[in-house]
Structures are given as C-alpha cells and as structure tokens.
C-alpha cells in the first residue's frame, strides 16, 4: 500500500499509559507538517484516546505528541498567519455512542462546535 500513497505515513507508533484510573496516550511522528498535518493528528489521536477510554472505562489523561522533522512549508506561511488572527472558540463536547472499537465502529457527535471559515492550503511534499 505504501507505493499507492502520495506521501509515506508521518506517524508510526503510539503507546498508552494507565495511572490512577486515567489513560494517557503518546504518539510519535517522523515528520510533522504544522499547518495541514499536525492539527488532524491531534484530533485523530484525541479521538482514539476517547474511544479507548470509552472501551476500558478509564478517564482520559494526557495526550502527548512527539515530532521529528517539524516544519511549516513556505507555501503555508500566509495561511498560517491567517490562522493566527482567528478567534479561538471553546472546545466542543465529544459524545460517543455505539462504540465497538474492535470492529472500528462508533458514532461521534460534536456538541457546541464553533469554527471559523476553512483556510485552504496546497499539499506539499
């Protein structure tokens, strides 16, 4: 499948840690595109943490990302500057239902999700 991908996967592993009834998750990436990739990676691993907690009955702990080649592409600088001027909104509440993590089935509802208009940026490699 790697030969069919536009880019090789940037993230390659994650580990979980349990302490005091909380589940924490840390993931590793060889490369981190700060504008297009990292925000998606944060939300994806955050969702994985919540799904694992829903499955195990543990409470969410800390989410940690470890990045190797961390970069902001030249053709993303204007978009990133625009992002920095945007109003910050409170995080939404994530509601999970029908979670069957072993079969990859679940429903996600974002409650009170507020956002600014999309900012387009080209994919770089």
Regions inferred by a protein language model and the residue ranges of each:
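Active-site helix-to-loop segments that bind/position phosphate- or nucleotide-bearing substrates
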Residues: 1-125
């Amino acid at each position: 499948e790697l030969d069919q991908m536009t880019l090789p996967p940037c993230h390659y592993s994650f580990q979980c840690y349990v302490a005091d009834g909380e589940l924490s998750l840390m993931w590793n990436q060889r490369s981190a595109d700060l504008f297009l990739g990292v925000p998606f990676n944060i939300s994806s691993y955050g969702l994985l943490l919540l799904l694992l907690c829903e499955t195990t009955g543990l409470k969410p702990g800390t989410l940690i990302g470890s990045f190797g080649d961390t970069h902001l592409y030249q053709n993303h600088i204007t978009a990133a500057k625009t992002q920095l001027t945007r109003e910050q909104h409170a995080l939404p509440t994530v509601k999970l239902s029908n979670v069957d993590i072993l079969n990859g089935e679940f429903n996600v509802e974002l409650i009170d999700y507020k956002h600014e208009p999309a900012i387009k940026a080209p994919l770089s490699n």
